[in-house]
Amino acid sequence: MSIEFKNVDYVYAPGTPFQTQGLIDISFKIEKGSFVAIAGHTGSGKSTLMQHFDGLLLPSKGEITVAGEQINANTSSKALKAIRKKVGLVFQFPENQLFEETVLKDVMFGPLNFGFSEQKAKEQAVEWIKKVGLSEDMMDKSPFELSGGQMRRVAIAGVMAYEPEILCLDEPAAGLDPEGQKQMFEIFKEYQRAGHTVILISHNMDDISEYADDMLVLDHGHLIKHASPQEIFSDQEWVKKHYLDEPATSRLTRELQKGGFQFSEMPLTIESLVSKVANELKKKGDMDE
């Protein structure tokens, strides 16, 4: 088991006039090595939930287990450091986690902070700077001289350089062009294939349907659905009711069904849809012979 929540509540500004319930009685389990998407409309609690994974926020009530480590309302700062070595969090706004004077130093910070030698930290940083698509001539530049998309790549490299067991990503493709988005998601998927757990917050249902194998849907601090993307996107009425967008493949599949195509299950990628359509056409061709 990678992550387990048991009856978790989170309250912002408790005991003040600004008290707000951020999470309400949340319980779920995430298996090690899975790619999990967190979806829901703005203000549903997605980022609040993710910030509990590394103890950036502590639950007001309930218990969390992350990679064998326990988190509750009384977890100490010392215990949290062990958790944060196992959980890497990339924020929605990369400028919030960049602070060093050069790109290389910024990406080295995580490995150094978690006990890597100077040489090993530099090797890891250089490797991941290249993996996320940045050139070597950027390593000595200030991260604040870069474009928004480049800053996002630096922030991602800075977390992945110490190779945490669990990688948490809050809208990681924002600010990237379509080619850059695909490149980054392939990196995340490869990271999952290497045995790590990847957790994604995204408003883009196409990304979720293509890359995730598990999905949590939040609404006003409640967990209202925990299922596979295939199960969730197969229920068009439920998706509409909870203000989620349908992936493009789901919409296209429904149009094909209106034209007489039959699918035993909802294809979630263009590749799988093309394959299923080709099989249907072949069956029809065989029947006509």
UniProtKB/Swiss-Prot annotation:
Question: Where does this one sit in the cell?
Answer: Cell membrane
Keyword Ubl conjugation listed? The answer is no
Give the enzyme's EC designation: 7.-.-.-
Record GO terms (molecular function)? ATP binding; ATP hydrolysis activity; ATPase-coupled transmembrane transporter activity
Kindly list the positions annotated as binding ATP: 40-47
InterPro entries the record matches: AAA+_ATPase, ABC_transporter-like_ATP-bd, ABC_transporter-like_CS, ABC_transpr_CbiO/EcfA_su, ECF_ABC_transporter_ATP-bd, EcfA2, P-loop_NTPase
* Top EC class, one word: translocase
Topology in the lipid bilayer:
Peripheral membrane protein
- Coiled-coil intervals: none
Q: Which GO terms describe its cellular component?
A: ATP-binding cassette (ABC) transporter complex
Every copy of the ABC transporter domain together lies at 3-245
The record's PANTHER family line, in alphabetical order, gives:
ENERGY-COUPLING FACTOR TRANSPORTER ATP-BINDING PROTEIN ECFA2, HEAVY METAL TRANSPORTER
Assembly and interactions?
Forms a stable energy-coupling factor (ECF) transporter complex composed of 2 membrane-embedded substrate-binding proteins (S component), 2 ATP-binding proteins (A component) and 2 transmembrane proteins (T component).
Q: Which family is annotated?
A: Belongs to the ABC transporter superfamily. Energy-coupling factor EcfA family.
- What task does this protein carry out? ATP-binding (A) component of a common energy-coupling factor (ECF) ABC-transporter complex. Unlike classic ABC transporters this ECF transporter provides the energy necessary to transport a number of different substrates.
Spell out the protein name for this chain.
Energy-coupling factor transporter ATP-binding protein EcfA2
